[in-house]
């Protein structure tokens, strides 16, 4: 009798001899996410698998900086002082999640209790409404191109976090950044 078995084990982050953190966490996922409009109302944006798992989107995360919080779009003129690590691989689909190999060189954010992850990226936002997995959405994100991966206190994706054992951490203040779309819509992100 021929059979197949797939043993599952949770991937844990490891520390190198130098104290760097190596991990392969979920960095984002598909689903409907709330965003606040400039007038305080909420809109709900769909990150559909057809867009999230597009190969050019998955390829765009490789080599991007891991940052301490979100600091706007990161490039060679503003990366010093905010970059704490790097994404070492392209994104890979794992169910509804995107995973990637990362290294964190400056671990002070993590040691201070921040272990959630939040992607910074550009996209085209379409006004499209519908229902996805029982959740209503009003907009759809397309053409996702990653710019950085931020270490934050609480990420929007919920399950995007480092694979660390829980320990007591100190509270830190989160930074908010305001983004304005070409159509004039503004929203805050952490």
In which residue ranges do the predicted regions lie?
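Signature of dsDNA virion morphogenesis modules
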Residues: 1-172, 176-188
């Amino acid at each position: 009798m021929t059979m197949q078995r797939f043993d599952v084990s949770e991937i844990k982050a490891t520390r190198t001899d130098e104290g760097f953190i190596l991990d392969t966490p979920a960095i984002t996922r598909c689903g409907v996410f709330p965003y606040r409009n400039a007038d305080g109302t909420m809109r709900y944006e769909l990150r559909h698998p057809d867009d999230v798992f597009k190969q050019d989107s998955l390829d765009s995360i490789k080599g991007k900086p891991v940052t301490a919080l979100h600091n706007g779009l990161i490039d060679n003129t503003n990366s010093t002082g905010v970059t704490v690590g790097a994404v070492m691989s392209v994104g890979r689909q794992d169910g509804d999640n995107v995973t990637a190999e990362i290294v964190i060189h400056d671990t002070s954010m993590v040691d201070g209790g921040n272990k959630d992850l939040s992607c910074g990226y550009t996209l085209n936002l379409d006004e499209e409404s519908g229902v996805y997995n029982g959740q209503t959405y009003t907009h759809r994100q397309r053409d996702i191109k990653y710019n950085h991966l931020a270490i934050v206190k609480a990420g929007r994706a919920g399950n995007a976090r480092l694979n660390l054992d829980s320990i007591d951490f100190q509270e830190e203040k989160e930074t908010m950044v305001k983004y304005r779309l070409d159509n004039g819509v503004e929203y805050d992100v952490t």
